[in-house]
Every structure is written in structure tokens, then in C-alpha cells.
Design a protein with these regions (language model features):
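Short aromatic-glycine-(Arg/Gly/Cys) micro-motifs in beta-strand/loop hairpins
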Residues: 40-59
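Short glycine-rich, low-complexity/disordered patches
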Residues: 8, 39-44, 83-84
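Intrinsically disordered, low-complexity coil/linker segments enriched for acidic/polar
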Residues: 23, 28, 45, 64-66
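A short, exposed loop/beta-hairpin motif centered on an aromatic-Gly-Thr core
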Residues: 15-19, 56-67
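Short intrinsically disordered terminal tails
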Residues: 1-5, 78-84
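Small side chains
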Residues: 4, 16, 46-50, 64, ...
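Negatively charged, low-complexity tracts enriched in Asp/Glu with abundant Ser/Thr
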Residues: 1-34
Length: 84
């Protein structure tokens, strides 16, 4: 489990902000247990969103380089996919 996550709950759903340097393996281990929506910033890349479908982790890449923009885009894509 990832410790010390901060959450953006300015809109629904609440999305956890993953600290820089967190590996995808750590993200997978956390999301498999907690089923949070996670915003991840991989090294050298824009933000990606990750969520658990019940059987696997899904990663939505290229949500933007700006955190606020990425949060908005992640929420929009979750809604379009029927995950909300």
C-alpha cells in the first residue's frame, strides 16, 4: 500500500495523487487492494490515470502535463467509460 497519498476531492470522484518516483509495480499493488483512482506522473512523461476494473488495472496515458488538466481529463474519460 502507498502511504501518505494526497487526494483531489474538488470534484467527484476523489483521485489520489501518487508521489513522484513511485513504480508501476507499487501502483498496481496499491490499486489491487484499495481500488482508488490514481493520478501518476511517470518520469519524463505527462500524467497517467490508473484504476481497478475488478480484475485488472487500467492505465489511461497522456492525460496532459499539467496536474489540473490531467485530473479533469481523467474524470472525463472515467465518465465516458462508465466507471463513475
Amino acid at each position: 500500500m502507498l502511504d501518505g497519498l494526497t487526494y483531489d476531492d474538488s470534484e467527484s470522484p476523489s483521485i489520489a495523487l501518487v508521489p513522484p518516483g513511485t513504480s508501476w509495480e507499487q501502483v498496481h499493488d496499491h490499486i489491487k487492494i484499495a481500488h482508488d483512482f490514481l493520478l501518476v506522473q511517470p518520469v519524463g512523461s505527462g500524467y497517467a490515470g490508473a484504476y481497478w476494473t475488478g480484475t485488472q488495472m487500467v492505465v489511461l496515458e497522456e492525460l496532459g502535463a499539467d496536474q489540473d488538466e490531467a485530473l479533469d481529463e481523467f474524470r472525463e474519460q472515467l465518465g465516458q467509460r462508465g466507471e463513475l
